């Protein structure tokens, strides 16, 4: 199975192997380049899920993404499912008990502290918003603005949402993970806070 070469490969190495260096990082294109089958047909039996990964009739991993979800949510969900593929399915393909089903609770951490889900979320963040690219984009934005003192956090967040084609919430979580904004930062409460 050609997909086995991706077992346990970190997101940054996948991007490097596929020569993807500039945002946005489209997980549908990444999946295609990796050789992963992705379905996003309307399936009422799966509609309560945002996405899932399972073995198809040929024993090959296949990912399903709910087409009823907003596009940016589909993007994060697919990146998350690719994380499951890389870390939980391919390394244990012979023992894989499918499917892994993901919904709002597992994807968006509503108190969930499942290590598999945390790892898949981390993979998704690294795939969609890699540190090397975030840093380059932010530095370029600061330069064009004449310095970070001329920008608010909202300015930077809004720009990143546009450049990386992910949700505002995904960008905020990622910036908090990277220590670029305080953990207690709230987008809607910002009152002209300049970048630090």
Provide a role label for each language-model segment.
Residues 1-196:
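Active-site hotspot residues in diverse enzymes, especially metal/ion-binding acidic/histidine motifs
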């Amino acid at each position: 199975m050609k997909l086995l070469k991706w077992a346990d490969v970190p997101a940054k190495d996948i991007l490097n192997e596929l020569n993807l260096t500039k945002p946005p990082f489209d997980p549908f294109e990444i999946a295609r380049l990796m050789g992963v089958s992705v379905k996003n047909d309307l399936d009422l039996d799966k509609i309560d899920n945002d996405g899932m990964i399972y073995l198809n009739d040929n024993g090959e991993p296949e990912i399903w993404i709910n087409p009823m979800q907003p596009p940016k949510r589909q993007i994060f969900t697919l990146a998350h499912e690719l994380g499951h593929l890389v870390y939980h399915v391919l390394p244990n393909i012979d023992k894989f008990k499918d499917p892994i089903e993901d919904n709002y609770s597992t994807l968006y951490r509503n108190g969930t502290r499942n290590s598999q889900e945390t790892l898949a979320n981390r993979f998704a963040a690294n795939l969609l918003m890699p540190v090397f690219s975030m840093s380059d984009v932010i530095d370029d934005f600061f330069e064009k603005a004449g310095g970070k003192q001329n920008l608010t956090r909202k300015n930077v967040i809004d720009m990143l949402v546009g450049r990386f084609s992910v949700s505002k919430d995904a960008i905020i979580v990622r910036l908090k993970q990277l220590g670029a904004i305080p953990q207690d930062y709230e987008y809607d409460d910002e009152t002209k806070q300049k970048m630090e």
